[in-house]
Structures are given as C-alpha cells and as structure tokens.
Regions:
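Extracytoplasmic/luminal low-complexity segments enriched in Pro/Gly and acidic/polar residues
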Residues: 146-239
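Structured segments of extracytoplasmic/periplasmic soluble domains
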Residues: 98-106, 138-142, 182, 186
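Extended, Lys/Arg-enriched charged tracts that mediate electrostatic binding to polyanionic substrates
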Residues: 113-118
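Preferential activation on post-signal-peptide N-terminal prodomains/segments
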Residues: 1-111, 122-129
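Amphipathic N-proximal alpha-helical interface segments
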Residues: 58-82, 122-160, 220-235
C-alpha cells in the first residue's frame, strides 16, 4: 500500500516523494498535560534562585536572579539581573540547553541569530526525545550573558504528560491522500515532499486544562512546511 501511495501521489497531483524519505508509522499516542502549580514554582526557583515573591495564583515570580512570568497556557518569560547568568566561555546554544534542562525543558536548538550585539537562540521542547512542535523558548544573550527569555514566543509544557487513551494515529497512506486532497482543494503549489519529523501538537484549545498532546507529523516540501494531525487528519500550513 505504501508503494501504491507513492504512485498515486505522483499520478493524481504530480507530487514527488522518494521512497527512502517515507518514514515508519507513528508510534505515538495522545497524551494529556495538567497544569502543576508546584512544578511551576519549582521551575521558577530553578531560574531565579531563592524566590522573594510568588503570588497565590503564580503568574509573576521574583527571585535573586530576576523576575519571571508563567501563564496557564504555558507561555513564560523572564528578565534576568546583570551578572545572574554569565556565559563564562560557554556557547549560547549549549548554555541555553543546559539552563532549560534545570526546569525540565528538554531542549532542541532550532536556530541562532545575531543582530545588533544580541544573540537570539530559539529552542524547541521535546518530551522523552520527541519534539513538541508548538512549545518553544527564545533566549536573548547580550554582553556575554543571558538577559531574558522572550515574552509572547516562549511556551512550555505546564505539567508532566500522561497517556490519554489508546487512540492510534492514522497511517501514512491515509495522511498522504489527505494531503493530496488538501493541496488540490486549496490550490496549493507542491512539487515534492522533502522530509517528515514525528512529534506532538497541542490541541488548538491551549487554554483547556488538561491540554492534549496530539501525535503529528511536521512535513517539509519544496514550497513550505505543514503540520499533519495524525488523529484528525487535519493539515495546517506552518505559520
């Protein structure tokens, strides 16, 4: 069936997909994440040192090294005092990965940009080695030290994921046919699929608690990238 899918992909839509790029089926099931205020406070203390202020509903924490904000939907940010986090010869990427590990954020470096004396490192959160596509942290370095975790673009898992039922992901053949239909219906241009990355997406209602982690594919093409929800079959262009 997988071989047939490659032929159908080409015959119906003229989209190329090399056989060696086609991955194994997804071995992931949906997970739920419930906000854990105690974990949040522990993470704030790991970032800020001894906490001097932590309101009952959390949100804003103040400590020896600066201040941080944590939101119900997973957004977080921090501003650090001068001298709190000197690089001390470390590379910004390595420093960022190690720092985020202290708050249980298993990080994968996505990009590094330098502009106007600042180095900006963007990292993606993983859970047990699997990327969570819409959980990223953006760390800003200046003058050889960490200055901030950027607001509005930094999101984390708010608790420890737990398995949620046994619903199995759609197989790749089904998803490929969904993609063909999506491309045709939306008059998208796509000549070739160039890569697949397995991971999770958070359900669109990020304010819900618990939130759901949905098995998904991140699919690159010659004309942009897409997220394929492997439970519902929904196709969403990146960005």
């Amino acid at each position: 069936a997988r071989e047939d899918a490659l032929a159908v992909l080409w015959e119906t839509s003229r989209i190329r997909l090399e056989r060696e790029i086609l991955p194994e089926e997804l071995d992931l099931t949906p997970m739920s994440v419930t906000r854990d205020p105690e974990l949040e406070e522990t993470q704030a203390a790991a970032l800020l040192g001894e906490l001097t202020a932590s309101p009952p509903e959390a949100l804003r924490y103040v400590g020896a090294k600066g201040a941080a904000q944590f939101y119900v939907d997973g957004e977080f940010s921090a501003e650090f005092r001068t001298g709190a986090y000197p690089l001390a010869g470390a590379e910004p990427e390595e420093f960022a990965v190690d720092l985020l590990a202290t708050i249980g954020f298993e990080a994968q470096v996505m990009s590094t940009e330098e502009s106007g004396g600042e180095t900006v490192v963007t990292l993606r959160q993983c859970w047990e080695g699997t990327p969570v596509f819409d959980r990223t942290a953006v760390l800003v370095f200046r003058d050889e030290e960490l200055k901030s975790i950027q607001r509005n673009v930094s999101y984390r898992l708010t608790g420890i994921p737990k398995q949620e039922g046994m619903e199995q992901p759609m197989n790749l053949v089904t998803l490929l046919m969904r993609f063909v239909d999506y491309v045709n219906r939306n008059s998208r241009v796509c000549n070739e699929i160039t890569g697949f990355t397995a991971g999770y997406l958070l359900d669109s209602n990020a304010q819900s608690d618990p939130a759901l982690l949905i098995p998904a594919w991140y699919v690159t093409t010659d004309q942009g990238s897409y997220f394929w929800n492997a439970i519902t079959g929904e196709i969403t262009p990146e960005g």
